[in-house]
Amino acid sequence: MEELIIYTTNKGACAVDLHSGNNITHFKNDETAPNLSVFLTNTPSGNPLLFSAQTKGAMMHVYNWNRESVDQQIVLPEKLSCLAASTCGTWLAGGSASGRLFVWELASGKLVFSREVHYQAVTKLAFTDGLLFSTSKDARVLGWSLVTMASDPKDCQPCITWTEHNLGVVDLVVGGGPTRDTRVFTVSTDKTVRIWDVSSTALLTTITLPAAETPTTLAVDQLERTLFVGCASGNILSVSLYDVSPSTGLVSVGGASGVVESGNVALSHHKSAVTSLALSFDATLLVSADDKGFICVWDLPSRQVSRSIKQPRAEMNPVTYVQTITTHGLPTEKYNPKTAVKLPMLKRVQDDKPEDHDILVKIQPRQKTVAHEDTLQQMVESAQFGGDSLAGKVVQLENELSQAKSSFASLKESHDTLWNIYQRQQ
């Protein structure tokens, strides 16, 4: 299973091999900005799709994996400032510069939620199990229940509100695991990274960044051992979330709302602001991009750049987004417009009353597998073959035992005869 890098610029988007750097596919006519693109493998249409909100207006481009040109152009109710999709493929969320939050049901295109929830521009959206988190330049982090959003949008209020940041929040990462064990990481222009517990809504730790650095983006490895902060200077700060204790081994840093100063460990190669970060599946490689068009692949154990990704036709367009994916589930056949299934158009107006609506569900083709009857027959034949072989071995052992008994009886008879002769001679 290979890994790919998907990245977007203000001129297009590409997918390249993470380890070789070879170009896999290219998407044309894409003009986007940071936090305005998301690649989704699991979609109602059954095809992996790249969603990319455009910077020139209230428009979103949808790209099919095996098609270079735009597959769908969707008119939005407002120009977006950030975009996110749930990994299950059910929800698509967008935030605007006015502070409005939009949530669509992808299978129907229905706009289930639309409201101004922040005082300033929404900067980042992220889904977790049953929750949607939104951050803004107003320094607040809000958590929303997706169930309440879909069932009672008029009276829906944030179930989580975090206001400890002093300046605008620029990025947010949601950790893995179920909701009760999930941690949320936020980074702000107040030069702090804060770690939150979703279950208790408590602030766990505050990590202060160097005064000379202004954070722009954030990444956390899947095991939540290390976080990486991209900065406007081009540096990437690496912050370990565990310390080594001589008595107890590894211990987590901070806790109890404590403040921790980040170390001076930095990955230095970019000469301009880092715009996006992404980690490989095993967290041994870090992909970073900047606003001058450079994309670097870092080998984290050695903290060296192992590869630089070149844009097509030697262009150097500002990179706005990077994401790592695996090739599992990606189609290999060519794009066929006759069989391709398109998503329903996203609605721009929220319905006042709940109503029945159709949803798009693509039934996947039947996979070629061994029939149950054939499998059962093979098991029966195997058991029968094993039984016949075992019975033959039993018969063979019984014959050998019978021969041994016969030989023993003959030897005993000879021994008794010789012993009697010896007794008479005495």
From Swiss-Prot:
Keyword vocabulary terms for this entry: Nucleus, Repeat, Ribosome biogenesis, rRNA processing, WD repeat
Cellular compartments per GO CC: heterochromatin; nuclear pre-replicative complex; rixosome complex
Subcellular location, record wording: Nucleus
Protein's GO biological process: DNA-templated DNA replication; rRNA processing
PROSITE patterns in alphabetical order: WD_REPEATS_1, WD_REPEATS_2, WD_REPEATS_REGION
Spans of repeat WD: 75-114, 117-154, 164-206, 269-308
PANTHER family xrefs: WD REPEAT-CONTAINING PROTEIN 18, WD-REPEAT PROTEIN 18
Function summary: Component of the RIX1 complex required for processing of ITS2 sequences from 35S pre-rRNA.
Family stated for the protein in its record: Belongs to the WD repeat IPI3/WDR18 family.
Oligomer and partners: Component of the RIX1 complex, composed of IPI1, RIX1/IPI2 and IPI3 in a 1:2:2 stoichiometry. The complex interacts (via RIX1) with MDN1 (via its hexameric AAA ATPase ring) and the pre-60S ribosome particles.
Protein name: Pre-rRNA-processing protein IPI3
